[in-house]
């Protein structure tokens, strides 16, 4: 997704809302994504029969970024401080310690953290990570939440 203006290439601005949901933790879970580029929107969702809320929050972000086919300027709204702080703050120490926490314990969800890290570092996206309070009336977050719940229903075999 690039725009060419006067012979120069600029990155397209994309707004993304992500959310994860889990019925039981662990239990059946879902993830939802709302991507918006100008007036164009795309919705994505999926689920797993046995997972955790944090894994679904991470999967939503991974699926959102993987859906972008070219480097973009991304404003990514998420209601998970675990994911936002993990990718912007904690990951540097984890990598330096061989994917271990400061307490020397293995990082939870390391498979997803490594996938997310690879997407963020190799994609060329410029990402502005913005936390939004969940279930507080933000229209984009509410839509991502509804999509995540559709993912739960799919994981349960109801969709």
Curated annotation (Swiss-Prot):
Its cofactor is Mg(2+). Binds 1 Mg(2+) ion per subunit. May bind a second metal ion at a regulatory site, or after substrate binding. It catalyses: Endonucleolytic cleavage to 5'-phosphomonoester. Keywords: Cytoplasm, Endonuclease, Hydrolase, Magnesium, Metal-binding, Nuclease. The keyword Lipid metabolism does not apply. GO terms for biological process: DNA replication, removal of RNA primer. Its EC number is 3.1.26.4. Mg(2+) 2 binds at residues 19, 145. GO terms for cellular component: cytoplasm. PROSITE patterns: RNASE_H_1. One of its GO terms (molecular function) is RNA-DNA hybrid ribonuclease activity. Its main location: cytoplasm. Residues 10-153 form the RNase H type-1 domain. The keyword Isomerase does not apply. InterPro entries: RNase_H, RNaseH-like_sf, RNaseH_domain, RNaseH_sf, RNaseHI. Mg(2+) 1 binds at residues 19, 57, 79. It is found in: Cytoplasm. Belongs to the RNase H family. Endonuclease that specifically degrades the RNA of RNA-DNA hybrids. Monomer. This is Ribonuclease H.
């Amino acid at each position: 997704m690039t725009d060419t203006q006067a012979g120069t290439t600029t990155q397209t601005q994309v707004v993304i809302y992500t959310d994860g949901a889990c019925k039981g933790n662990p239990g059946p879970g879902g993830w939802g994504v709302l991507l918006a580029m100008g007036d164009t929107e795309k919705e994505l969702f999926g689920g797993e029969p046995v997972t955790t809320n944090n894994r679904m929050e991470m999967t939503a972000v991974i699926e959102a970024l993987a859906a972008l086919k070219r480097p973009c300027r991304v404003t990514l709204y998420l209601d998970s401080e675990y994911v936002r702080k993990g990718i912007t703050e904690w990951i540097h120490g984890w990598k330096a310690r061989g994917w271990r926490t400061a307490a020397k314990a293995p990082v939870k969800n390391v498979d997803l953290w490594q996938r997310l890290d690879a997407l963020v570092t190799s994609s060329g996206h410029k990402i502005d990570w913005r936390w939004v309070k969940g279930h507080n009336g933000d229209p984009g977050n509410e839509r991502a939440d509804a999509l995540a719940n559709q993912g739960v229903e799919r994981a349960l075999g109801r969709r």
